[in-house]
């Protein structure tokens, strides 16, 4: 009986630990993601990229290779999975 209780306690502890997120890593979705990103970029002194930056390249096929990260990837990295502030800042 004591062995079953010890096994149950050990399994519940393992399950609880596996569901915990590391410190500094959170999930950001929707408005919370947009506001957090806007605040972080503003505090870092980074302005939002404008379309004028892409026009200077002259070729539409170069747009995906411009500096910075793509806009679609942030949802994959920070909404579907937890991400850190450093990952968010890389999208500024």
Swiss-Prot record:
Disulfide bonds join 29-79, 41-92, 78-83. GO terms for molecular function: growth factor activity; hormone activity. Its main location: secreted. The keyword Oxidoreductase does not apply. Residues 50-70 form a propeptide. Residues 1-19 form the signal peptide. Keywords: Cleavage on pair of basic residues, Disulfide bond, Hormone, Pyrrolidone carboxylic acid, Secreted, Signal. Gene3D superfamilies: Insulin-like. The keyword Oxidoreductase does not apply. The modification Pyrrolidone carboxylic acid is found at residue 20. It is found in: Secreted. One of its GO terms (cellular component) is extracellular space. It holds the Pfam family Insulin. Heterodimer of a B chain and an A chain linked by two disulfide bonds. Silk worm has two kinds of PTTH: 4K-PTTH and 22K-PTTH; there are many forms of 4K-PTTH. Belongs to the insulin family. Brain peptide responsible for activation of prothoracic glands to produce ecdysone in insects. This is Bombyxin A-3. It comes from Bombyx mori. The lineage of its organism: Eukaryota, Metazoa, Ecdysozoa, Arthropoda, Hexapoda. The gene is BBXA3.
